[in-house]
Every structure is written in structure tokens, then in C-alpha cells.
Regions:
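Rieske [2Fe-2S] iron-sulfur-binding domain
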Residues: 1-91, 95-109
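C-terminal catalytic domain of Rieske-type non-heme iron oxygenases
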Residues: 15, 79, 84-350
Length: 350
């Protein structure tokens, strides 16, 4: 994330460990691979080696008086919640608190601990990361730009009695199928309100349109049921954490999106499709049916964001007003971001 590089792995007992990827000697990264398996970390520069937990193991050529306990790799915070791994870079030893409780409850029926990555696509989007969040936080653009998405969802449906009655009926359908899972808690047109002051996370279950039991092009299942679900028609669970993650979880698959800003003009985006770990491609699911819905929708958004970025770079651009009816969440995101910038300024002054 920016200049921060963090190694996330598991120790010999399976415990999660996060380490800042910089040797305590001269700063060389000790891990340069995307993924893999090692018995210890070895700096490629002067061969200092570290145990998986970051403790310094060897440092040949150094003074015998060196206190090895003082020169382990610096730890970052890490925790697993409902199958998602969260890493934080600040000094707060455990900032999750209420978020951990809420997210764990929402994610419990999805069974992400028993999921596997069926497919992954890495994108380089020529847009500032904040423009990507602006795009994510409103669906005013959806009818013009996401014909596949609006067929499946109520995010941009008109707010009238007909729509509300339809959503109520679909919510009732989902409630019958949910069983032990969390019930629909966003039963109205439009997007769930997020973010809000002091809350960098949210989780909500939203109804799908009639004839859709999953987010696929035709609404039909694309993979075996995940987790605790006994039926497909459970709507979608949506999880969001600013500044860099969101996911849509249907009963049979999850699509997770992670942002990594690479400068003011570029954002690296990773999109992953997850299914139950027992599911086998070609036997239990067809990637040709699993991928298109969110691949098409995501790439439509990346195109919008890149074009928007070019427009705001125009010297003649002056920001216009937000729509209070359609862009409330964009306003909320701007407020969240400005508050974080102000907080950082206060910390710097201290």
C-alpha cells in the first residue's frame, strides 16, 4: 500500500503473522515474491535471516554484542475475521473492536474459511483511487453504464410504492431461504449508507431482483452452495471497508475487490472470484458462467473512472455540486476522507 510492503503468512503452528518487508540491517526487502512457501526469511543483500515470526536468526559478520532480540522484523497488525484477513499499519495494537464483531456475524454463513480462489484478475486503472470509490458509492450511472448489473439489483430502482413492495416480497423470499443466516437488512431502493463518521466498515444483505438467485448474467446458480446456505435465494451480502476493499457475496460465490493506490494517477485493483473449496472447475462450475457478471461490470467501471480521471485533470475543470438525492454516499465518502486527513494532520502536529 503506497510505500508500505507487508509480508502476510502463517507460522509453523498455522498462526497469522504480518511483518514489514524491510531488513533491519540496510532496509532491503526480505521477500520479493508474490506468494510461496519458505522456512525462514533471508535478506538477499547481506544474508541476515529471520524466523517466520520475524525474530532475527543469523547476522554473520556483526559484532557479537549485537542484541538480536532488538533487531527482528517489525510486526504489523493482522487478524482474520470470517475468513477475511485484515492488516493494519498504524500503532494501535487492535483497532478492529466493534468492526470485528459485526463483520464476523455477517460473514459467518458465507463460509469464507472454506473457500478457494477460483479466478483472479489484476488491473491497472489509470485513475486516482478516490475516484474509484466515488464511482462505487453511487449507482446513478448504472442504468447508462451497467445494463447487466441493473437487471439483477435494485441499486438504481425508482423509489416508489411498486419498487418497495417488490423488494419486500423478495426480502420475504430470502428470509424463508436464509435459515441460520443473517436476514435482509437493506430493504429499500438505492445503496446502503456508507461510510459514516467513525465507521470504516459496513455489512448489509440486499435483495436481488425477481428471477435472480445469484449475481450471474441470467440469474441462475453458477457454483455449489457455500458455507451454511441451504438454498440459493438469499440475496447478496455486501461488505465494504474503506479505504481499499469491497465484496459481493451470493449463496454460491463471492467476488472481492481490493484497491492498492500506486500514485495519484494509478490504482492497482485485484478482483477475485471465490467458491467453496470442494468445488472443481469443469465439474461443479463453469468459469465461463462464473466470471462474466462481475468481469463485465468491473471493467465498465474502470473505463468510467479512467475517463473521469482524464476529465478532472483538465485545467478548466471546476467541481460541480453533488446531488443530495443520488450522491449521498459520495458526500459521505468525501467527508470520511477529509476527516481522516484532518486526523493525520493533528497527529503530525503532535
Amino acid at each position: 500500500m503506497g510505500d508500505d510492503s507487508v509480508i502476510v503468512g502463517r507460522g509453523h503452528r498455522g498462526e497469522l503473522i504480518a511483518l514489514h518487508n524491510t531488513c533491519r540491517h540496510r532496509g532491503m526487502p526480505v521477500c520479493e515474491g508474490e506468494s510461496g512457501h519458505v522456512e525462514r526469511w533471508v535478506c538477499p543483500y547481506h544474508q541476515w535471516s529471520y524466523e517466520l515470526d520475524g525474530s532475527l536468526r543469523t547476522c554473520g559478520g556483526m559484532n557479537d554484542q549485537l542484541q538480536r532480540a532488538d533487531y527482528g522484523l517489525v510486526r504489523a497488525g493482522v487478524a482474520e475475521i470470517g475468513g477475511l484477513v485484515f492488516v493494519w499499519l498504524g500503532s494501535d495494537p487492535e483497532p478492529l473492536g466493534e468492526a470485528a464483531t459485526e463483520l464476523a456475524a455477517a460473514l459467518a454463513p458465507q463460509g469464507l474459511e472454506r473457500a478457494t480462489v477460483a479466478h483472479q484478475i489484476d488491473y491497472e486503472v489509470g485513475a486516482n483511487w478516490k475516484l474509484i470509490w466515488d464511482n462505487n458509492r453511487e449507482c446513478w450511472h448504472c442504468h447508462a453504464s451497467h445494463p447487466q448489473y441493473v437487471r439483477a439489483n435494485f441499486d438504481n430502482a425508482p423509489d416508489n410504492e411498486t419498487t418497495r413492495a417488490l423488494i419486500a416480497r423478495r426480502s420475504s423470499d430470502h428470509a424463508r431461504a436464509l435459515g441460520v443466516a443473517r436476514a435482509v437488512d437493506h430493504g429499500e431502493p438505492g445503496l446502503y449508507p456508507f461510510p459514516s463518521p467513525g465507521r470504516w466498515w459496513s455489512a448489509s444483505r440486499t435483495s436481488l431482483a425477481p428471477d435472480f438467485v445469484t449475481e450471474s448474467l441470467d440469474g441462475a446458480p453458477v457454483a455449489p452452495l457455500m458455507g451454511e446456505y441451504a438454498e440459493y435465494d438469499v440475496g447478496t451480502l455486501r461488505v465494504r471497508t474503506v479505504p481499499n476493499f469491497w465484496c459481493h457475496a451470493s449463496a454460491d460465490h463471492v467476488v472481492a475487490t481490493r484497491l492498492a493506490p500506486a500514485g495519484p494517477e494509478l490504482t492497482r485493483v485485484r478482483v477475485q472470484w471465490l467458491v467453496d473449496r470442494e468445488a472443481v472447475a469443469g465439474r461443479d462450475y463453469d468459469p465461463g458462467r462464473l466470471l462474466p457478471f462481475w468481469r463485465v461490470t468491473s471493467e465498465q467501471d474502470w473505463s468510467l473512472c479512467e475517463r473521469n480521471h482524464r476529465g478532472v485533470r483538465n485545467p478548466a475543470f471546476v467541481p460541480g455540486p453533488y446531488s443530495l438525492a443520488r450522491e449521498q454516499n459520495v458526500i459521505a465518502f468525501a467527508d470520511w476522507y477529509l476527516a481522516r486527513v484532518a486526523d493525520a494532520g493533528q497527529v503530525a502536529k503532535a
